[in-house]
Amino acid sequence: MQARRIARELALMSIGQMPADRSRLQAKNLEELVLASVRTLREEANESLQRACTELRQGHNRLEASELTAPTVEAARREVAAAIALAEQAINRVGASLELPEFVRLADELQVRAYAFELLGAFVREGDNLDKLLDTCMEGWQVERLTRIDRDILRLALVEMVELKSVPFRVAIDEAVELAKKYSTDTAVRFINGVLRRVVQHLQLEQRPRR
């Protein structure tokens, strides 16, 4: 996993925990938000594994029940199919859970947290201006009407594209799309991609020479 990708996810989780009035947030507050996000990830890993165990037990129980209580062959097949679906769901959940410990370990690394702090600091300073830019570039929408997760993904992308200029705008868009795939909906993926491309056109980023 790339350090900056993990930092973006930490920053995204931290923004969601910020108070509406960001003016009094200090570096210490930002650090506490990031640490709270890491703790949340640990808890999610444990809960996901527990749910996987529960689903496996449920699948096993349905298989046993199908042998004893199913009145017809067709009913037995349905029970077996349901048991297999539960098992597959559990396996997928375990696979996702196994990635989280590595994610959490890397999230504790200095360079990851440093970039997360940098993203959050820029957002605290320039968040209002970024929201105005989004309002200008969204067709028929306002920032306040967006779901929180979609709004924060867009804000983070603008922090990297406009404020920090820490990655090429194409990378910022691609990373925002990946965050949307993980944390939001298919519709949001297309929406976020479209909004950020309108930002690029509005700021004429494609016409600027690459550094």
UniProtKB/Swiss-Prot annotation:
One of its GO terms (biological process) is transcription antitermination. GO terms for cellular component: cytosol. GO terms for molecular function: RNA binding. InterPro entries: NusB-like_sf, NusB_fam, NusB_RsmB_TIM44. Keywords: RNA-binding, Transcription, Transcription antitermination, Transcription regulation. Coiled coil: none annotated. Pfam families: NusB. The keyword tRNA processing does not apply. The keyword Phosphoprotein does not apply. Involved in transcription antitermination. Required for transcription of ribosomal RNA (rRNA) genes. Binds specifically to the boxA antiterminator sequence of the ribosomal RNA (rrn) operons. Belongs to the NusB family. This is Transcription antitermination protein NusB. The gene is nusB.
